[in-house]
Amino acid sequence: MIRRGRLLTVAAAVGAVVALSATASAAAPQDAEGFGGRHSVREHLSSYHEHPLALSTTGNGQFRATLNERTGEITWQLSYADLSGAITQAHIHFGHAFQAGGISAFLCTNAGNGPVGTQTCPAAPATISGTLRAADVIGPAAQGIAAGEFAEFAKAFRAGVTYANVHTAAFPAGEIRAQLDR
């Protein structure tokens, strides 16, 4: 009888845990793929991550970002140092680790080619930060993300198929890069 009582107690406890898990899952807002809430990355930028050719420079950096799906924003911070030339611009691109993808959003530019309100890139060493919203997403349309399509950009960010890239006068295609997948 005592054994049967313990079995019933364990069964009730397991049932309560399952019920609470189901309730918590139902309470969190989710999109069609089942995502909801926040997603964060923290990456080290290096010239070795550049594509199609890895580079060997002293340039380095850090990129941190948090996607808040409830507010439709990505807050970010980019630090860079020891670049081999003057920084010209920095972006988030849409592409795999060994792919050169199109620009999704500007982080900064000194080339005057960013959307209105894009901050200028200070000389290295520097740390800049900002918030990306739908109005900051510029594409890439050729890869299926239209300008202003924050939900598609957010899906790519969550899936780890975006990367941060810092471009310099010495390396216009990019000097340091990090895949945003951790």
Segments the model singles out, each with a brief description of its role:
Residues 2-9, 17-90, 94-182:
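Metal-centered catalytic cores of metalloenzymes
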